[in-house]
Each structure stands twice: as structure tokens, then as C-alpha cells.
């Protein structure tokens, strides 16, 4: 997937032509299908890549741009359709074993990973049978960032001999997955160690069963397709907060136990012990200057914690978040004595349950030069979760698409989809005026044409609308990621937009070289675009903290302060650019051939409200004033302008050698809470806060956010007709790279694969 031009994956989240930034895997704008059925997790909208039967993949199709007419709201940005193999005349069994290890820089042991894929397909009289299994164990290249999973599944199809063109059957899949996520690092000096503020894992059991029925009447040119699904996921959050005691943490910070009486005295007599030191700086603070005040606080911190680093403060903050309630001036001593005891690790949370029921019907009729497709779909989701609470949703849609071929060269396609969505008691998530009356449905339209200019030469144009409802998780999520929170936003609205494309495709052949070149210009526009906002929040009201008054209110009311993220509508956005790709084969001789794919994508991701937003933020002189992103540029967060990808495979007799190459330009903007790239006369309050939480992230990001090049290499051979061996080295040059702050890509990785077909 990562080698497809125009398709990128960040934190499990796919993005087509810059349509998505960083959302930590929730609420995809790109729909992933396996044999026509979505693998998006109901409720969260995240893509469960582990449910895809990779051991049985036949081909992968990518449709770029809005595809919501046929496929629903999650296809706002594009569609990736994975099609599995069908049984042939002879039974086929495939076994693939792989093992690998991560190279430096991690020093504590040698992290390993390995997996086993099994698949078997055959025909038994009128039955088609396919079964598959996968197991995978990955220690991870980062500390405590592992993945362990087992998946089994299959397909059984019965071709009814009594009715020509009738088949029915069932797809079944089960996945057990035990894994931890990696949100942010501990410090720039320890990038492969989890931050104690954000250390969370899950244990999941996912199961679905998909019954289906297909009937094709070739004489009448009609096809009926019925598909259904029952889905269940049981998910248990495992919180891995630090098990260090307060004694361990403060000892690392250079704290002297004899200073405890001094701390108690300061806490009980702060009016005389602390106020005279800090009060003189109040006039400076009122004028927006905090360097003097922060200097005194730094002296106080160095007095008690002379060897403390930002990572130590992370440990301390995480420890405090897990040790509540905090002391008052009357019980400081007793609280400190109790605090010296080791912290007990949190037990697994209660299991969250998500259920989904899906029905889909599609009818198509072929005419002499055209085809009509109509259908409808219904999905009900019920979530009973500590993460989101109890919520239910209904999604009902009907669609129509008409395709017509004119003069043997021109193909025209038009379609419309009507969609209704409800969450809990919000019965009008969308409203549309039809003949003056408001109805709770959203129509989306799509049209396209493809014209054959000449032999192997085509021009195409398309326009498609998109509409994506926020998932239950995006709207109602409330959870603790080991200290970092995720906060709900009940006011989150659906995002909508449209995509237009003009493209040209030309086949070519020069001697033994043949292939095609494709170039497309695209334009995408969004309204109420949903983005991920990282910062400080009120733990009770979930308000975003963007001023001192809100900060003081969070403390004075007892609500408390949380570090975390929230999904929010950012307004209008547009993304336009050019997508250029070519692929082909050069035949040197009967035994030697070179296959290649090369692609370049230029995207310009624009925040259309940037001028008004910058003016509003510039006018806010509050000491805790927040900005929407790390700079004043016009660009959306977590996007790159340029992307180049190349795949080359040389085959000679039973040997093969190949490489994947990828280059991306720098990330244009990130969250302000992480990095501020603006030039200032002196640091502000947020600069000091970032330094305490994240260390010298500002300089690290400035030095490393300059684009990166990654190269993979593979060498293989066919040992026999049925057995092949392949060795791979990913990140051959061992580049350290990041697409976002506080997340470093995998170092050089060595892999050995052995496969057998019989």
C-alpha cells in the first residue's frame, strides 16, 4: 500500500493526495473494502488493517477522489478495494513464513518479529472453499510498543446447480489482537521510549460473518446482489502508566529527602515563603513578559531537582495524574509518606462492546450500450463503551448510477446518493431543502466521462461530491491514554466537499519496452473539515484551554487540567495539485525482465480561513493564547507538498532483485501545542511549558523536518518450482525520519521470508 503513488499511511491512517493529515487512526476519509465490504471499524471509523486477509490477496484497486455515490460517506477522499483470490480448478495451498529483526539504534536487546500465513482454496463439487490464517508477533522497534495477533477466516460459496447464475455463501473472519500504540516519545534524547503521559494498549477480539447471495440472469442482463454483516468487537484498554514510585522519580531528579520539611513549610506558609519572591514579577507578567517569573520558577525547580530533565518531569506529571486526590496544606506530610510507596499498575479496564448490523442490496441492468445500477444499504451500530459511553446510530442510503457508452469511444457515468444518518436523539444530522421543505437527508452527486482519443490513449474528467458524518468515537470519545486524554465534542458537524479531476492516460511501446503514463490534475474542497487538535483541556467541561481565565477556572473549580486531543471542525479547505505516474516492463530477453512503477504527486493543501484566523489569534494577547498550528502559513497541518515513489524489480531466471524508494518533502505545519516555529523576541509561557513537557523539541523539529528519503531492498530466488526464498532490508540507509513530531520511523530492518505453494 505504501508504494502506491498518491497514497500515504500515517499512524494507520490512509490519505489520498493529501486529503487527510494526522488523526491517530480515527475517522477515515478513505474507504477500504475487501470484496465489496468495508473494513472500517464501526463506531470509530478507523481502518483495521489486520482484518485484511493478506495471505489471499489477488489485486488492489485504488479510486482517487470522492466516491460517495456508490460507497457511502467514508469514501470522501478515495477508495481502496482489496479483492481476494477465487479457487481454481486445482486445490492450492500456500504457506509463508517470515522472521525479522530491527537494527540499531535501540540498544536494549534485539527486538524481533515474525509471522506465519496459511491459505488453502479448492472446489468441492458445487462449493468454492477458501480458508486462511495469520499469526504475527512483533516486539516493536520502540520500547513497550508490541503487536501480537492471530486471525482466522474463510469463504464458502455454493453455486446452485438448479438455477443458473445463482450463488450464495458466507465470509467469516475472527481476529485476536494484543497491542500497544505509540502516541508521543519520552524526549528527543530517548525517541524510542514511550512518554509516560501517553502509554496505552488494547486487547481486542473482533468477529464478523457476512452472508451473501448473487443472482445473474445473462439473458436479461440483470444482476441482484444481497450482502449482510453481523459484526462484534470486544475491546479492553490496558493502561501502562509508569510503575515508578515517587522516590524513584525524584531520586532521578536529584531530590534530597532532607528537603521534605522545606517543601511542607512552603506549602503551608506560601504567603510568606513564596509570594515575596514572585509578586515583584506581576507587572512584567501583566505586560506579557514571563521570562523573569519563569526564571525564578526555574531556580526553585533546580533547587529541589538539580539533575531533572524534561523526561523526568514527564514521569512526575504522569505519576501525579495517576495519584489522586492531590494534597491540601493540612495533609502534605501524610500524603508524601503514602506517595513513596510503589504505584500499583492499573488493571485492565472493563471490556467495551461494539455491535454492527449491515444489509446491502444492489441491482444492475445491462442494456445494449448502457448499464443502470440502483441499490440501498442500512447499517446500525451500537456501542457500549467506557471510551464513548452508550450510543447507537443508524445509516440508511439509496443510490443510483447510470453508465452509457456513446460512439464506441465515449463512456459517461452519472449518479446520485441519498443518505440519512442518526446518532442517539440527533435525528437530523443533515438537512436538505427539497421544494421548500427540510428533509433529514443529504444528497451527493457524481459524474464522469472517459474518452478514447486513439489507440491506448484516453482522457477522463470527473466531478464527485462527498459527505462524511463524524464517527461515534470522534464525537463522544473520552478516555485516558495513560495520562493524555481524548475529549468529546458533541457539537462536531459532518464534513462535506467535492472533488474534480482531469486526467490523461497514454500507453507506450518502444521495442521491448511497454507501459503507460498517467497524468491528472485534481482539485478538492472541504467545508467543516474535521481535524485533530492537540492541547490543554478542562477535565470536566472539555473546553479547550486558550486563555489564562480558562486555565485558572479549571483549577479553582476543581475540574482539573488535562493534556490531550479533540476533534473539531476547522472550516474551509482546498487541496489541489498534479498526480503523475508511469509503470511498465522492459524485456531484455526470455529470461530477464525489469518491471517498474514511478510516481510523483504535488499537493497544495490550503486553509482557506487562514487570514481571518491569523488576525484573530494575533489580536489575542493573553499569556495562554493558543494558535491553531505551528506557523502562520496558509497550509493545513500534517501535509507535505511533494511525494516521489519508485518501485523497481529485476528478474533473471529464478533470481530477483528489487527496491522501493520514497521521498517526501517537509511537513508544512503541525500542532502549536507541540511546536511553535515563529520568531519571537523572548520566549512566551507556552515555550516554557513545551520545554518542560517535550524537551528541546523545537530545535529537533527545525533540524529534522527537511524532507526524507527512504529506500528498501529485496533479493530472492526460486529454490524449486514450489518454494521461494526472499531477503529484505527495509530502510536500507538507516535514515531517521518523522512525518510528525515525537514519532520516529523504524530503523533498518532485516527480514527473511520463505514461501511454498503446492
For the regions a protein language model found, what residue spans apply to each?
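Extracytoplasmic beta-strand/coil segments of soluble accessory domains associated
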Residues: 1-37
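Short acidic/polar hinge/loop motifs at secondary-structure boundaries
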Residues: 3, 37-64
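A beta-strand signature from Gram-negative outer-membrane beta-barrel systems
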Residues: 51-96
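Short strand-turn segments of transmembrane beta-barrel domains in outer membranes
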Residues: 67, 84-120, 133, 138-142
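Gram-negative outer-membrane beta-barrel transporters
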Residues: 96, 407-408, 514, 521-525, ...
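Flexible loop and strand-edge segments within Gram-negative outer membrane beta-barrel domains
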Residues: 138-149, 159, 163-220, 224, ...
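Membrane-embedded beta-barrel scaffold of Gram-negative outer-membrane proteins
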Residues: 225-229, 233-239, 452, 458-462, ...
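Structural signature of Gram-negative outer-membrane beta-barrels, strongest in the C-terminal barrel
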Residues: 369-377, 381, 389-525
